[in-house]
A protein has these predicted regions:
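Extracytoplasmic gating/loop element in the C-terminal half of outer-membrane beta-barrel translocons
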Residues: 390-485, 489-490
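Glycine-rich, aromatic-lined ligand/substrate-binding cores of catalytic
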Residues: 363-398
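Conserved active-site-proximal loop/helix segments of enzymes involved in bacterial cell-wall
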Residues: 219-223, 351-353, 401-403
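A short beta-strand motif that forms part of the nucleic acid-binding face
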Residues: 84, 211, 388-391, 401
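Conserved small-residue
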Residues: 142, 150, 257-364, 404, ...
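Residues embedded in well-ordered regular secondary structure
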Residues: 10-21, 25, 31, 55, ...
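Extracellular/periplasmic, surface-exposed regions of secreted and cell-surface proteins
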Residues: 1-304, 445, 449-499
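Conserved SET/PR-domain catalytic core that frames the SAM/AdoMet-binding pocket
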Residues: 269, 356, 366-380, 463-468
């Protein structure tokens, strides 16, 4: 073999083929009838699905659902749904869940006592819905499937001999603990709202109030500060149904579509959503410090050290480094002038993970989201614009986004960030908002998991802009064309934010 300068046969090759097969069965029965002012309908649906990917065990689901509706005079509306769904993720006996839901509606604008409003009120509908929904998602990790089964997995750390290629024969070890009682995560949802159309369709209004009570949340007690197993057990705690989270908020949309004269048309349709959640129960460790607890707080709040000040001079640095019998006030190395000093929240004379971190800022997911689409049209010209933004959100920056002179990000070598411009120096020590710049030694006191790098993530951006022109009909009709439009479109053209 001249390519490899050897006459030996090259073996031990590797090949891999993968295929995905999906199978879906559905049986559906529908019924619908109208008589006098009554309208009734019903539906029964059975479905079963399976998905096989590569050499994994098939994913399988099946269920039966039903729906019944009744309307009287297109004025009083009702609907009832029920689902009986089964998932492979749970043990027999816990595999199926029953999930009912219902809704009612009242088209109040059709009532006799609303007579006289039709001159300005086109439609007014009040509505409400309620229901129970379920989730069988355990995690995004395929290895977490069948969490109700105890299994064995390949061992590590010791080999029982070696094969001819030098690979060891590993043993087996018991996998993570199973939970045969694991079942569906559930959420009770309620929604009330109204829809209105006024002035011959020019003005539209839609408003909703929603509330969700989520319970039996599928989680593992090994996450964070939850009540898991001690290390001596040697295994992670199993997945369990534990946790309660409430969420509530409002949706609002307002639209106006009208004309000025014969040729000028315009529209605007702003929308707004506010949602806030609260952890009602979480099986977490009680450290005796309320500021550490997640129960009673919002999901996604940042758990950080709190910056107190920067070391003012060498005398202060020496004093802090001498604390705790020379081990120092903070565990990340010697402090120097300009370094960050964190707040001792539990007042034990030192900074540590268990007592000196707390929840700060807004959650990662915005609580407020809004959009402002609008546009105009004049003869053949048209312009459409979409602004979009969010409020009540915080982000914890890390890595190359904030650290001094990062050498591990290919496009960030030595780049100075805007927050570095207000760094600590002897001349700026009284007004600095960022610690001294360092590289190499003594840089660890800028802990990335701290309020120093917690930023307001509010933003508004010009998400979409489109400008177009349509050729006059009397020009293109000779070519047998119905419409010819030229346009220029841009996405994410500008962004206003703090960082």
């Amino acid at each position: 073999n001249p390519l490899y300068s050897t006459d030996e046969t090259i073996s031990n090759g590797f090949s891999h083929n993968a295929a995905e097969n999906k199978t879906y069965y559905q049986l559906k029965l529908d019924y619908q009838r109208e008589f006098d002012r009554h309208n009734v309908s019903a539906m029964v649906l059975f479905n079963r699905s399976s998905r096989a990917y590569d050499n994994r065990v098939e994913y399988r689901y099946q269920g039966i659902s039903g729906r019944a509706t009744y309307a009287y005079d297109n004025k009083y509306l009702t609907e009832f749904n029920i689902g009986y769904n089964g998932s492979e993720n749970f043990a027999p006996g816990n595999r199926y869940g029953v999930f009912p839901a219902g809704s009612i509606g009242w088209v109040i604008s059709r009532e006799a006592f609303m007579k006289g409003t039709e001159k300005w009120l086109d439609n007014l509908k009040l509505r409400a819905s309620f229901g129970l929904v379920g989730s069988d998602k355990i995690s995004d990790n395929n290895d977490d499937r069948f969490a109700y089964l105890q299994f064995f997995q390949g061992g590590d750390g010791y080999s029982f001999g070696f094969n001819e290629f030098g690979s060891g024969y590993d043993g087996l070890k018991e996998g993570n603990f199973a939970n045969p009682n694991l079942t569906w995560e559930k959420a009770r949802k309620t929604n009330v709202g109204f829809d209105a159309t006024l002035f011959n369709g020019k003005l539209t209004i839609a408003a909703d109030y929603f509330r969700e009570h989520r319970y039996d949340i599928i989680t593992t007690l090994s996450d964070g500060d939850k009540m898991g197993y001690p290390d001596i057990v040697g295994k992670d705690a199993p997945f369990v149904n534990s946790g309660i989270v409430d969420n509530q908020g409002i949706d609002f949309e307002l639209g106006w579509n009208s004309t000025i004269g014969k040729d000028f048309r315009y529209y605007i349709k702003p929308n707004f959503t506010f949602a806030r959640n609260k952890i009602k129960f979480m099986n977490e460790v009680d450290y005796g410090n309320e500021y550490r607890q997640k129960t009673g707080r919002r999901l996604g709040e940042h758990f950080v050290y709190v910056v107190d000040h920067f070391v003012y001079d060498q005398a202060e640095a020496d004093k802090l480094n001498a604390m705790n019998d020379g081990r120092g006030f903070q565990p990340w190395g010697e402090l120097h002038p300009g370094d960050v000093v964190y707040k001792d929240l539990n007042q034990d004379g030192k900074i540590d993970d268990y007592g000196d971190r707390t929840h700060m800022g807004f959650p990662r997911t915005p609580e407020i989201q809004f959009g402002i689409p609008f546009g105009i049209q004049y003869k053949g010209f048209d312009v459409s614009v979409m602004f979009q933004g969010s409020l009540n959100s915080s982000i914890l920056l890390n890595g190359a986004a904030v650290w001094d002179f990062p050498s591990y990000e290919q496009d960030q070598y030595g780049k100075v960030k805007h927050m570095h411009l207000n760094r600590w120096t002897e001349a700026t020590k009284d007004v600095a908002t960022y610690p001294r710049l360092t590289y190499g030694a003594y840089e660890n006191n800028k802990n990335g998991n701290s309020s120093l790098f917690l930023y307001n993530a509010n933003y508004i951006r010009l998400k979409n802009l489109e400008v177009g022109y349509s050729l006059p009909k009397n020009i293109i009709r000779f070519a047998g064309l119905q419409n010819v439009r030229f346009y220029v479109q841009g996405f994410k053209l500008t962004n206003i934010r703090q960082f």
